[in-house]
Amino acid sequence: MADTKAKIIYTELLKEDLVVIRLVPITGMPKYKTGQFLTIGLPVRAENKIVKRAYSIASHAENRDYFEFVIRWVRKPLPGRVTTELFYLSVGDEVLLGDPTGDDLIIEDKYRNGEPDNRRVVCVGGGTGLAPFIAFAHHFRDTN
């Protein structure tokens, strides 16, 4: 499928290098699975072209209202071209979105015999590698 336009409906700067962004595709929310990622494309002024980068979806698949991303701006050795532009966008601005892709993050909550599996789950991730785990935690909370 081709890229689709999406509007920014929410931004929150958590730290000088960490932002939460929520996007709504203009054509409606596609189906996706918790743990997937998609590409965000923006015109990069310095290069006079659209540049796309992959970002993990931090919202869970049961959320049909928006995509949420937690994005860190790494400036060394060189700042990311798309990430840098994302930090300067505002509510109402538009970006291009690719289709959700990648494997989903599934942890079964039942044994094969149907009995509930009440063991604790430990997820390890660093930096913005936490985004899929945020999605999983929301999914787990809302489905159990």
Where are the language model's segments positioned?
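Ferredoxin-reductase
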Residues: A2-D93
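FNR/FR-type flavoprotein reductase catalytic core
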Residues: L78-N144
